[in-house]
Amino acid sequence: MNVNQTRTFRLAYSSCPNDTFIFKAIARQLIDLNGIGFDIHIDDVEALNQAAVKVTHDITKLSFAALGNLLDRYALLRSGAALGNGCGPLLVSRPGCSFQDTGGRRLTVAVPGMGTTAYHLFRFFMADRFPEVDFTIHPMSFEKIMPAVADQRADFGLIIHEGRFVYPAMGLVQIADLGQWWEDKTGLPIPLGCIAVRRDLGLETACHIQTLIRRGVDHAFAHPDQGADYIRQHAQEMEDQVIRQHIDLYVNDFSKDLGNTGEQAVTAFFAYARKTGMIPDTDLPLFAC
């Protein structure tokens, strides 16, 4: 394809402030898109993971864990990702709950989807720290997890995104920081979410889209207040301070370009997932360009 010809691509990402911050320049056309159009769809990450199984979107936000099972259809872009330190999922519960004193009862854990990176980190963590504990998984939308734990419909909850900042207000306590566990284990940042592109779009198109996303990140860093209403529009009634915390935690230099350290982190995550049988082996290249 000649990338200078006008063409519209289906672009999907989440309503979370880190994604809307990264893509606001594209969504509001605050940068030159060079004749490329985007039909934008916004949904939660697990819904996007499921949509990618059917290759619903041309460019899509995915959890790294989901991408590991979709490499026959999608390849990874080096821009737009969420990696970082101190920003991994938290395992929370009500005060007094623990894995050490289960009374032989099978525990219930609410998670933001089976295909999420958070769930994979939970499985890695449990195999490493509590291999003897039995648990039942209840997948649900991330915004429903804390209420489920608070209302005793689940013993534990795996929380992501803005949940990191608000769980104490719901009377919940942290049981484990799975991001910290990963960092201690590997010495690398936590691979959380990524932007992937359909393999059949070809190298030239993939690289062009990657460049646009990188320029969008640059614009967002340089002009953080432009398009702020777009972020707020999708922020699920978050307070401005929580939105700012969210962006500061999940958007960083890795969002512009993974670089060597980011590549090492992603490679380590996939190696760990393959070793534990959670994603298949493949000879396909990981990166689109």
Positions of the model-derived regions?
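A local structural motif
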Residues: 31-41, 126-140, 279-284
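A structural signal for short loop-to-beta-strand junctions that line the ligand-binding cleft
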Residues: 9-10, 73-81, 108-109
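Beta->alpha turn/N-cap motifs
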Residues: 44-46, 55-68, 141-142, 159-165
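Hydrophobic/proline-rich hinge and linker segments of small-molecule sensing/allosteric domains
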Residues: 76-99, 183-200
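Extracytoplasmic small-molecule ligand-binding "clamshell" domains
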Residues: 18-22, 31-63
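Bilobed "Venus flytrap"/periplasmic-binding protein-like clamshell domains
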Residues: 4-28, 89-156, 160-162, 264
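Pocket-lining segment of extracytoplasmic ligand-binding domains
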Residues: 140-233
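Secondary-structure end/capping motifs
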Residues: 202-272
